[in-house]
Amino acid sequence: GQGLVVPEGEDVLDAKGRTILPAFIDTHCHWRTPGFEYKEDIATGSAAAAAGGYTFVNLMPNTKPVCSTPEIAHAVEAEAKRIGLCDANQTVSITRDFDGKTIDHLLTLPEDIKFITEDGNGVMNNAVMARVFAIATERGLTVMSHAEDREISPWDYRLAENIETVRNCHL
C-alpha cells in the first residue's frame, strides 16, 4: 500500500487486482475417520481443506464407530496434527452412538471437547434435548443441532425445520 515501509530483507507480494482473504474455518466437515476412509480420510480431507484456504475444520461424528468418546476424538485430532496441513476439532455425538437417548457420556467429556452434534440426525426426544441443553450450559459445550423433524421432512422439509425452530426457541 501507499507509504508501506518494508523491513530490509522482506519480500513484498504485488496483490493489485486480487482479493486477499484470511484463512477460512469450516464448521461442518466430514473426514469419515474412523470407519469410512474410502469416502474421505484425514490426509485427503486435510489436503482439500488447505487447498481451499481452510486452516481449521470442525469434524462431524458420523463415523464407524460413532465418535462418542474422547478417545476417538483425540485420535482423529492427533492424526490431523501429525499430517499438519490444517487444525481439526473432532465433535462428539450428542447421544451415545446416535441412539437418540443416552447422554451420560456428556457428563465426563474432558474440557477440550467443546462441540456436540448428531450431525444429520436430530434428536427427536424433547426431554432428552432439554437435558442436553442443561448439561451443555453447565459444561460449556456448544450444541450443533440438525433441527428438523424426521417424520415430517420427507414430505415438507420447510415445515420440519420450522417445527424444530419453534421448539428450540421455547426451551
Which residue stretches match the model-derived regions?
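Histidine-rich, glycine-flanked metal-binding segment
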Residues: 1-21
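Metal-associated gating/positioning segment near the N- to mid-region
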Residues: 15-83
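Active-site mouth loops of central-metabolism enzymes
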Residues: 27-40, 63, 89-101, 167-171
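Divalent metal-dependent hydrolysis catalytic cores, especially in the metallo-beta-lactamase
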Residues: 44-67, 83-96, 110-124, 140-144, ...
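Active-site gating loops and adjacent loop-to-helix segments of metal-dependent hydrolytic enzymes
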Residues: 52-54, 75-87, 149-171
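Active-site-adjacent beta->alpha loops and helix N-cap segments on the catalytic face
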Residues: 66-76, 122-135
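Distinct, well-ordered alpha-helical segments
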Residues: 69-73, 98-107, 153-159
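Functional cores that coordinate and move charged inorganic groups
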Residues: 121, 129-164
